[in-house]
């Protein structure tokens, strides 16, 4: 048998590969990156469309080989990243679209540690970005506060001075007669100065716009007139009279108004009256192919405001959305009497009410303060029920054809512009990737290339939602570990400012690590509002699967508090949460401790 890397020059590919019509297990053992990417690209399509291929992968060791590719870790090399993403996509396709036996094989192939590491890395990056953003905002606010105190005093002094001066000017204008209007010189004088004015007329100026400011602004800067001679004033006034008659710019007023009209010089105009400012405020076309205009000076301030996000407590008070799968948190102030009357809970001698939980204000206050977010979540405005499991290629502002995107997702196509993902914005850029992208350090870009994408987290949560509903597999989720080669602790350590890079301890072999990681607490963190709604939805599905009864053990349930894990000795031994009637707790202490995160996925049952 020939080597799997043996190439055929006339077709420029490996001799053993996977196509859309042929599956060969030997192609997955290829050690060359490029032919392996080609095979994985076609395998992604096959795992999406063919149930037979998914079944074959569970018995020929294909799933184990794909998981081994994932455990090798993500690299900064473009081709390696592409290979890793395609292998991950294949495993997700097998687990999501496969049968119960196929999903069981995915879990038994040790895919849960890979998912746990991806979720843990994302949480660490989120916490790092939020911590740095909070520290910078506090530093800027303290600096702004120190500068704002003297500025406010000076501003108040200047404003009082201006008010007094304006009052004095108004009183003076009431007492004295209005100043005489400027007379236009006779025609012979204009002819004598025609040569001098012709030089001024040679300079083309933009068309003047009608002045919409009140007539009082025409007297602004009267002290400038004292520095000019009468001849210059007449010549300038005559020039303005020829270029733009004042009668066309201002509405006509009678002589009884109290003052006459005179031309307005450019140095007397307010900034809002200058033609250059009006031309700069013209609306730009909204065509996606038209390049944007240069950023105005105030756009940076607007961008800063746009990238800020209200805290979790403010969102709870301002949000009017329902408490469904989108993941909006619920409060504990509702009276559950009506809910109990509609569907009473049976077999509960030690009934526990959510409203009876003590010290709820302290718990909720601590959670709200600890989950404030200072970065924007761009996916909140999207109401997508599905997601594209392929790479999201970079865009330049042009319109996206949704039909083509869906076809690419079905075919498992990969992008050709993935090389720019670390430096250019994606279709829906993560707020945390935007935060690190603004940092031009090498460490920040290293985190960008190794950190999980939003698509990776979303696919991980979706895969967990499909495989976690089988109670016989729950031990795989509650006793797992992290993959050493997938962890990004070294990259996160390099982000610390003012600290020298330290050598982290050498990575241990994975088989030596204890299975002491429970994946459900990691998933529960994605039910908090500052994550996207899709992440909240699938995380809530996973947490509700934790509350399923185990029919193989007589229909008993497990305590929903992850640190407890106690099982019922008989049916209906534990009390249900009175609000959602899904979770069960063995005691009030477990219920109070679990409410910190359970409140984010505790949805009222109709």
Swiss-Prot record:
The keyword Nucleotide-binding does not apply. Its main location: cytoplasm. Pfam families: zf-MYND. Residues 178-188 have a biased composition (Pro residues). A zinc finger (MYND-type) spans 561-602. GO terms for molecular function: zinc ion binding. Residues 149-170, 280-316 have a biased composition (Polar residues). It comes from the Eukaryota. Keywords: Cytoplasm, Metal-binding, Sporulation, Zinc, Zinc-finger. SUPFAM superfamilies: ARM repeat, HIT/MYND zinc finger-like. PROSITE patterns: ZF_MYND_1 (PS01360), ZF_MYND_2 (PS50865). InterPro entries: ARM-type_fold, MYND-type_zinc_finger, Znf_MYND. It is found in: Cytoplasm. Gene3D superfamilies: 6.10.140.2220. One of its GO terms (cellular component) is cytoplasm. Transmembrane segments: none annotated. Residues 321-337 have a biased composition (Acidic residues). Signal peptide: none annotated. Involved in determination of the onset of polarized growth and morphogenesis. Plays a role in the regulation of branching in hyphae and spore formation. Belongs to the MUB1/samB family. PANTHER family: MYND-TYPE ZINC FINGER PROTEIN MUB1. This is MYND-type zinc finger protein samB. It comes from Neosartorya fischeri (strain ATCC 1020 / DSM 3700 / CBS 544.65 / FGSC A1164 / JCM 1740 / NRRL 181 / WB 181). The lineage of its organism: Eukaryota, Fungi, Dikarya, Ascomycota, Pezizomycotina.
């Amino acid at each position: 048998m020939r080597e799997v890397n043996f190439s055929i020059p006339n077709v420029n590919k490996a001799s053993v590969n996977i196509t859309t019509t042929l599956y060969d297990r030997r192609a997955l053992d290829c050690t060359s990156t490029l032919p392996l990417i080609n095979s994985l690209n076609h395998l992604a399509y096959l795992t999406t469309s063919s149930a037979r291929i998914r079944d074959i992968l569970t018995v020929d060791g294909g799933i184990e080989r794909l998981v081994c590719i994932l455990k090798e870790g993500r690299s900064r090399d473009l081709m390696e990243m592409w290979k890793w993403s395609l292998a991950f996509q294949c495993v997700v396709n097998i687990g999501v679209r496969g049968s119960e036996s196929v999903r069981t094989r995915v879990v038994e192939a040790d895919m849960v540690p890979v998912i746990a590491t991806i979720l843990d890395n994302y949480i660490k990056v989120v916490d790092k970005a939020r911590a740095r953003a909070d520290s910078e905002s506090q530093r800027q606010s303290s600096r702004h506060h120190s500068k704002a105190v003297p500025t406010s005093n000076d501003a108040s002094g200047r404003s009082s001075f201006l008010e007094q001066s304006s009052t004095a000017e108004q009183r003076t204008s009431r007492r004295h007669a209005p100043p005489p209007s400027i007379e236009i010189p006779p025609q012979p004088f204009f002819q004598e100065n025609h040569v001098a004015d012709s030089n001024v007329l040679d300079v083309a100026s933009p068309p003047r716009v009608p002045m919409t400011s009140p007539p009082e602004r025409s007297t602004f800067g009267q002290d400038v007139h004292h520095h000019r001679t009468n001849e210059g004033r007449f010549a300038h006034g005559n020039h303005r009279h020829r270029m733009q008659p004042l009668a066309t710019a201002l509405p006509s007023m009678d002589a009884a108004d109290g003052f006459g009209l005179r031309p307005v010089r450019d140095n007397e105009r307010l900034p809002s009256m200058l033609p250059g400012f009006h031309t700069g405020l013209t609306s730009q076309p909204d065509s996606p192919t038209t390049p944007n205009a240069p950023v105005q000076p105030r756009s940076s301030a607007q961008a800063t405001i746009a990238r800020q996000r209200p805290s979790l407590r403010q969102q709870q008070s301002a949000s009017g959305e329902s408490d469904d799968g989108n993941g909006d948190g619920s409060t504990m102030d509702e009276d559950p009497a009506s809910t109990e009357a509609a569907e009473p809970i049976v077999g509960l001698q030690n009934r526990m009410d959510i409203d009876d939980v003590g010290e709820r204000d302290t718990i909720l206050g601590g959670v709200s303060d600890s989950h404030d977010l200072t970065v924007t979540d761009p996916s909140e405005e999207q109401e997508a029920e599905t997601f594209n499991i392929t790479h999201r290629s970079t865009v330049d502002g042009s319109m996206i054809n949704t039909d083509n995107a869906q076809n690419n997702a079905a075919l498992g196509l990969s992008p050709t512009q993935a090389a720019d993902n670390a430096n250019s914005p994606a279709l829906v850029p993560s707020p945390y990737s935007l935060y690190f992208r603004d940092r031009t350090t090498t460490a920040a870009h290293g985190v960008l290339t190794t950190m999980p994408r939003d698509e990776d987290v979303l696919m991980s949560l979706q895969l967990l939602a499909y495989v976690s509903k089988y109670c016989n597999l729950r031990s795989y989720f509650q006793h797992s570990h992290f993959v050493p080669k997938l962890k990004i602790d070294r990259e996160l350590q390099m982000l610390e400012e003012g600290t020298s890079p330290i050598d982290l301890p050498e990575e241990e072999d994975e088989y030596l690590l204890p299975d002491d990681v429970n994946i459900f607490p990691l998933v529960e963190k994605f039910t908090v509002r500052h994550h996207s709604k899709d992440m909240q939805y699938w995380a809530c599905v996973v947490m509700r699967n934790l509350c399923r009864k185990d029919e193989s053990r007589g229909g008993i349930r497990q305590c929903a508090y992850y640190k407890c894990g106690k099982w019922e000795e008989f049916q209906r031994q534990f009390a249900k949460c009175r609000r959602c009637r899904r979770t069960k707790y063995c005691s009030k202490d477990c219920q109070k401790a679990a409410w910190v995160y359970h409140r984010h996925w505790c949805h009222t049952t109709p």
